[in-house]
Amino acid sequence: MDQTVYSNIPRYTYDPYYTDNPYYGGWAYGTLDPYRRCGGYGGYGAFAIPPWRGLNSYEGFGKVYRPWAGRSLLVAPAIYRAGSGPVGSTPWGSGRQVNAARPIGGR
């Protein structure tokens, strides 16, 4: 990577492979190998497998019990996909905002 030493900038801000703790590497994903800090979860670099995906379609955060789904599983954790913003009045969350009718005489 970049071997330049910037004076007062912490090295972990510009070197994605640097870490103080040998068990955690890089910016995003921890690595399971304390000696080759090449990024965990398969270590594909920028294409690292996010921890909620994994390689096994049966287990993992935000997974659906569908082994035939392949790589078309949720790309982000279900808690992020569930919708941010106004919750909405439908049982399905915030797909479309449906405002409840006001009570009679209410303001």
Swiss-Prot record:
Kindly list the GO CC terms recorded for this protein: virion component
Which intervals of the chain are annotated as region Disordered?
A: 88-107
Keywords associated with the record = Virion
Where this protein primarily resides, as one coarse class? Answer: virion
Location within or outside the cell: Virion
**Entry protein name:** Uncharacterized protein L585
Q: Which organism is it from?
A: Acanthamoeba polyphaga mimivirus
